[in-house]
Amino acid sequence: MIFTFSGCGENKLSPINVYTDLGVLPIQAHRGGGLRIPENTLETFIETWEMGIIPEADIRTTSDDVIICIHDKNSKRLAPNTSDSLINISFSEISLAVAKTLDVGSFRGDQVQSIPTLEEVFKSMSGHPDRFIYLDYKKIDLDRLANMVRDHGLERQIIFTTKHHNLIIDWHSRIPESLSLLWIGGSLENVKKTFASIRENQFEGITTIQIHVKYPDVESDQPFKPAPDYLQARMKEVNEQGILFQVLPWRMVEPEVYTQLLELGVRSFATDYPIMTIDIYKKYMESI
């Protein structure tokens, strides 16, 4: 049976039901594992899957046209021990062989870890239907990516992730059964502008919408921004479309923030603190 995720209000299987049926919590580990462990490494992805949640992978292409998982444009932050001749060079200008020599694990612990190819990640997902992954798009040829996904039989395990609705529509035309996430950051004005645009386009192809939640302005009496009333209104609108509403509390580590969001009705998170988020989520859901 094949389910298509059209992002409209029609009868369809909700992403949260897909996850629940496979014993996966609707929680995204930002950049693969949050701030606790290395970013975008295969070891991190596996650890996150074993926690029962979903890693995010950032994808780029090397000079020899291999898709790799890495967030930054160069190795300066993630592999600070890189030689001076390479540290500021874009990954798009170095080969896979060179990229594989970089240690992207030690900046966050003692472990030495390398940059994985997307092919390596996909191989680790094949045969494991509970291993989902958010693929945060960064200038990858969509036809090539779609072919890779189909070759590995991962059409329903990939969550195509971007802030550009037109890219989700393009992706959905290639793999209509794929999940997707549109993330919305920046100012409240930008959030409103983005919602107006996707509303005009009938939320086409979107199965999850993520809003970034941040600390309030100093003069504000609200617990976070956007304010709870605005979040609830957008959540209601999104849910009516059969779309999963997700929030990313940006660098917010206070447990009470997550509890307040759950009390508002939020049922999906992206987080830099997955262990804490899992604990709060499970305890809250057991209490209701």
Predicted segment positions?
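Phosphate-group recognition and catalysis centered on beta-loop-alpha active-site segments
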Residues: 7-288
